[in-house]
Amino acid sequence: IRYFKSNSYYIPSKEEVQTYSKEQIKAVGEINEKCSDYTILTSPRLPQVETKSDSQIEELKQICRDGWKNILMPTGKVKDAKNIKIYKDRILQELDVIEDADLAGYFLIVADYVNEFRRRGVLVGPGRGSAAGCLISYLMAITLIDPIEYGLIFSRFFNSARKGSLPDIDIDFPPDQRENVITYLKEKYGHNRVCQMLTFGRLQGRSALKEVLRVNESCSFDQMNDITNKIPQEAAISDKLEEMDEPSVIRWALENDPDTLREYCWEEDGELQGDFAREFAQALRIEGTFKSQGKHAAGVVVSSIDLNNLCPMVKETRGNEKIAGMEMNDLEAIGAVKFDILGVNLLKKIHETCGAV
């Protein structure tokens, strides 16, 4: 009551609606007529990239030609007609997909900051994950791994069925250079158009069940650990969780490994049974809820417009820097573009070791 000026902020019952006056009902109709559909969802808002060519895709193709000459030819891999056809067919296949999905700008941005820091003498990672399966990335020196040589598949990285979404090129830098990369992007595309992003920690599997057991004081600390340790780690069954309509680590354990948990809880005729059935039911209900927030370890958001006009901005928990106050999928849905810039300590150690030899 202190904060609200009315006690009617709820969905009324049928009987209550029948008591409304004709004027009230008419007013609702007038409000409805003044409302219009709109959406904040949009395609990726990539910043404009300066090019020497007439278009971004032509710039990309020219870089690929240069990569053929300067990267592929010195290896001797494209001397005979058979290999030339293999590499050309793969390049044309990838270019068709990239052009159709309008991703040339994305590749140009990544290639720009990767090669800029290589020119500065920074040890940049040779390639991480599915991006190493893209021959275009190799020709642009984004990655240093030839996917043809190692039999890596482009469609695992990106394919025409994913049109409208963005690829995911993770780039590794020494930790002491990561902030320099972000500063470079801010200076190039605008300080108000580049920032890091928020991520939420969630109660999943073991942590959800442990929280319920702790709050309810259902058992000793040792027994709590014994029970929760019988729940598999999320990463260990991630592929299986993707097959579930509503992914749940606890539900998966109850259905697929019931004997391990039978001492504490089991399911019978759709109902949970056992000494800890109530706690398991509560844990299932809270699984997936947010428990904490922090700054994403790798994600950097870049946009063609002022981020203050695109998404909520929040202060990071350990500092005064403003970061995007939404998670990756939500940011991409409203047009922000995420680049993964990781700090890998091993790269720093390798660089220092090479300098000492």
Model-identified regions with their sequence ranges:
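Alpha-helical scaffold/interaction cores of sigma-54-like transcription cofactors
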Residues: I1-V357
